[in-house]
Amino acid sequence: MINHKLNKYINNKLANKKWLPNKTPNKRPYDFIITIPCYDEYDYIFKTLDSINSQDKNILKNTLVSVTINNSIDEDRSIIANNQRTYQKLLNNKYDFELIIIDAFSKNKSLESKISGVGMARKISVDLMISYLKLNS
């Protein structure tokens, strides 16, 4: 059961709704949620996800991992291209945990320069995934 303050936050303070996950998570609730901000990480993110995937399979069945691929609206083209490659590869990879990908990098979804960065990417992910977390009363 979501407590009153958390419910108020979810209803009023969530990040802009233009950032949506690539799919709706298959189940609810999850015991564990891992949020990963991803900026120009093609060479690293897959090692991180493989490391998570090597954990206890019973735990992974109840784990939701959210990767928010992000950049600012005035980002260098090479970073945007790196983020696009990362997104495409993530869509095709399979893991023992559920993976959600959030596009905060493409046209019309890139972050405004004044709010861009790891903190905003993490907020987007947490805001979207918090309602899938198992909360103890």
Regions found by a protein language model. Give the residues of each.
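Short beta-strand/loop segment that forms part of the nucleotide-sugar
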Residues: 61-73, 100-107
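N-proximal low-complexity "stem/linker" segments adjacent to membrane-targeting elements
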Residues: 1-68
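Active-site-proximal specificity loops/subdomain of glycosyltransferases
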Residues: 6-20, 76-137
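Short acidic, S/G/P-rich loop/turn micro-motifs used as interaction or catalytic elements
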Residues: 39-44, 72-75, 108
